[in-house]
Amino acid sequence: MKNGNGFQFSRRNLLGVGVITAAAATLVTTAAKADDAPADISKLPRVKQVLVAPPMLPEHEQVVTGGPKIIEVTMTIEEKKIVIDKEGTEIWAFTYNGTVPGPMIVAHEGDYVELTLKSLATNALEHNIDFHASTGALGGGALTKILPGQEVVLRWKAIKPGVFVYHCAPGDVMIPYHVVHGMNGAVMVLPRDGLKDAKGNALKYDAAYFIGEQDFYIPRDEKGTFKKYASAGEDLPESLDVMRGLIPSHVVFNGAVGALTGDKALKAKVGDNILFIHAQANRDSRPHLIGGHGDYVWETGKFANPPEVGLETWFIRGGSAGAALYRFRQPGIYAYVNHNLIEAVMLGATAHVKVDGQWNDDLMMQVAKPGPIKA
């Protein structure tokens, strides 16, 4: 079968379209032989990090003492059918550890991240992982291509502090195809002495939440109804045609419309400092906390740069992650949105934060209730 681009579709292509990265892996291996031997890390302590489903982060320290560690993590690739809205629209999501987005990994500058990446034997496609936080080999993508039933181990050194995207990048059109099927997540590399403001004062958070913004491109049938498919990869030619239009059918937080609202809303208390980590692997976004602000915002996500202060809306470039710290001063339900309001309200890019505590009339009060206009 061919799509409008003349690309031939078959299971063989699905499993073998990553020739570019396979060739790159050969070049990387050859070049590595000529490089200096890696540092001796055999005596570094090893820590197994238990990854958790977003929006939560794994257990971690904000400030560390002592030297670097090897952070061991395991992720399992699973192709699974998920429902992305209340109308029952489905997609075969490509996931790390079964979630969209994949789990947050947390390390400190100078640590080593050692990933064991597994692909379930029941999967249909070839996958890999590209860490924007890493250095070399296409972010590790050239060294991690695996088929169903395989695993690979990759270790990289965290030399850049900040929050970074990771995603699948098997080659050619399969790169955007995998990314817009949910195969992305984020890494946070903290400075060893923690976050700081522009004057070097320590900044700490009481809780942190990972919001992964995802654009989906679901094909429709001749009646305009979203199509459903029996297996992973079956939608490839039709999805590519929709993707070429650059108009998503859904823009959601954490995998589905309403995934972070209602009884799944994020939680905080008045006085809490909350760190929001926002990642978008494919499109630009404009996070805004309705009723609040970004007290300290690392808009580009890089903690070596001083944070901006007091922002109303911040900008996340497609293919990056950013972080915003806010101290909640009033109770109530806050809406955290992509402030392209069409995408927030009509396509799904909205989360809620439920904040408990006492109301402060000095910050805001209703002076007069709604009533007839006075003469």
Where are these regions (language model features)?
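Copper-binding active sites and cupredoxin-like electron-transfer domains
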Residues: 2-375
